[in-house]
């Protein structure tokens, strides 16, 4: 739950697929799901290539162990980001880009606990300005 955010925020989005099961799924509300570790690697490599600084603020974590090898979880997330901010400089703060909730399912594998599915449900986001 927290490692996902830390990897992205520390500039290591390319390592995020390691957190998922081989057949893991990541889905953002309103977008097509990204399924399987190969597709996840491609998706997070694109994220890694962006000149974007981000901060994922994770709150209200809940985890329910359903069986020895299965669990579910959720947490609230606020995402702040800014593009093109040089390393070591303070980025502009113009509000959260997304406020929502991650809803996860987890599976224990030979490599330990992995994300089987992660869905981002969006509660709030800034209005879209036409032409901008």
Model feature map: region roles:
Residues 1, 57-60, 101-102:
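Short structured motifs
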Residues 1-2, 38, 68, 131-132:
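Binding-site signature for planar aromatic cofactors or substrates
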Residues 52-55, 94-98:
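A generic structural micro-feature
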């Amino acid at each position: 739950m927290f490692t996902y955010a830390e990897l992205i925020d520390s500039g290591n989005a390319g390592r995020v697929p390691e957190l998922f099961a081989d057949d893991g799924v990541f889905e953002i509300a309103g977008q097509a799901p990204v399924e399987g570790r190969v597709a996840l690697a491609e998706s997070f490599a694109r994220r890694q290539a962006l000149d974007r600084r981000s901060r994922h603020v994770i709150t209200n974590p809940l985890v329910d162990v359903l069986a020895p090898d299965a669990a579910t979880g959720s947490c609230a997330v606020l995402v702040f980001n800014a593009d093109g901010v040089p390393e070591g400089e303070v980025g502009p703060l113009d509000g959260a880009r997304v406020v929502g909730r991650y809803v996860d399912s987890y599976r224990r594998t030979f490599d330990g606990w992995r994300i089987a599915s992660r869905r981002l449900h969006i509660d709030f986001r800034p209005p879209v300005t036409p032409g901008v």
